[in-house]
Structure formats: structure tokens, C-alpha cells
From Swiss-Prot:
Substrate binds at S63, N114, E158, N165, Y189, Y240, V258. This is Glutaminase. GO terms for molecular function: glutaminase activity. Its EC number is 3.5.1.2. It comes from Shewanella loihica (strain ATCC BAA-1088 / PV-4). Homotetramer.
Amino acid sequence: MPQKDLLETIIEQVRPLLGKGKVADYIPALAEVDPTKLGIAVTTIDGQTIGAGDYLEPFSIQSISKVFSLTVALTLYEEAEIWSRVGKEPSGQSFNSLVQIELERGVPRNPFINAGALIIADLLQSRLGAPKHRMLEVVRKLSANPHVIYDKRVAASEYEHSARNAAIAYLMKSFGNFNNDVDRVLRNYFHYCALKMSCADLSKAMLYLANRGQSLSAEQVVSPIQTRKLNALLATSGLYDGAGEFAYRVGMPGKSGVGGGIIAVIPGDMSICVWSPELDKNGNSLAGTAALEKLSQALGRSIF
């Protein structure tokens, strides 16, 4: 377990990076976030959580929600059903690319780009009567926080600027790889992205990825083998087009979101979340990545 003073030191070491990135501005509600926010939290497999900086302040988790969506899908479907609809390869394209969908006949490269996450949302819609309710239930349970909510203003803001995601969904539908009403699936998807959670919430919620599929409450969320596979996907595809850079610098499976959060996992040991809203050119938190790199170096830990 890292000590709290180590986390506080790391926060101060990366603070000079604030002002060098850019807050996501294509979602108006996200553009208003204070760019100086900076937090880190760690939860160990024995259930302890420590943090530093703004680690208790909720933020919009955005694409980090794709980990929860895929996890829920794995509890509802045989794996072969999921992987017949979406691939497992890094994309090498922007996270909202239409070109790749056209070239690969409606099958997205992986579940962590927008197209792949929309397929997962479509799968959830097919099996769940109230997907939004189920997702909130799952996340509250995993984080041990019954007060986690959807930020309805962020969800509405994303829906109002949803033309590209709608285009992706309709293009996949034209190839026969989308089964439900596009508008309904989009509304659910934007709600998942609009979950508001703190670094502490997320480090707790993602503990199952570090603990062979067991959550903070010792529930078996997914099997140990599924957990290993999830971590493999996170290591190769979790950081948009910056996955290689992240693996090189940080050396952990991870997932980022344009809200400035990044979750990372040291299997068998701990789950981590950092938050700093300013992003680098790949859409990943600039100071957050640096904080994870420093933590990895300080602990001498990497999966490689």
C-alpha cells in the first residue's frame, strides 16, 4: 500500500503540468469544469482506500463507463456472442472514427472506442428491461457508494451533440450489426458516460480488476479468466490512440475518459484512479498520466 504522503508528493510533482493540456470542449457541460482539479486515489485488495488532492470530488467518468458496460455484458452473454459483434484489436484511428466501420463492414475494432461501446450498449438493451437502472445499480454496488448518480445535464448535452455517434450507429445498423432503436441506445449510452464518480469511488469500483474478479464486497463480478482478459483489452486498447505510450510510461492496464479521469490496475495488488481535466493530444489526462507514471516508478510496479 502506498503511503498517503507519497500520493501527496506525486500530486505536487505533476501540478506544474496544469495549463499545458486542454479541457474537452466538444461537450459544452464538460468545457465548464475547473481545469486545475487534480486528484488520485488507490484501493488495495484488502479494501483500504487512500487519496490525495481532489480525490473525493465527483466528475464525469465518460469512457471509463465502457469498462462497466462490457463487464455487465459479460454477465449476460456467452463471450462468443459478444466477440462476434465487436473485435479485440487496437484501432489506430480516432475514438469516433467512421472510416474504420465502413472498411470493416460494421464490426468495431474493440469495445473501448465509441463504435464498440455502442455495440455493447445495444447488447445491454437487448437483454435488460431497464439498462440505465441496472448500470446505476451495478456501479453503486461496486463503489460501495449508494449516492452515485447520472449527471443529467451532461447526458443531455451529449445527446444534443450526438450526430457523429448516431452516424456510427446507423452505419453499423446498415451492415446488420445493430439491433435496437438507435435513439434509445444512444440515450442509454450517454447516461453511462454521464455517471458522476470521484477518484475514490472509481478506485473502489474497479477493484475487481485487481482482485481476480472479486469486488470490494467480495462478490465474484466476473471470473478470474474474464478478469485477465478484461485487463488484456485495457492494456492494448484502453487509452484511445495513446495505449502504446501509456504502456511504455505507466505499464498498467488502464482506461481513460475525456472527463480527465484514468483508472489503472496492478493485478493482485491495487486499483488506482487519477483525475485532471486537461487532456493531451490523444484525449487522455495529461497530468493524470504523469501521476500514474510517477506512482509506477515509485512502487517499482509494471505488468511488463
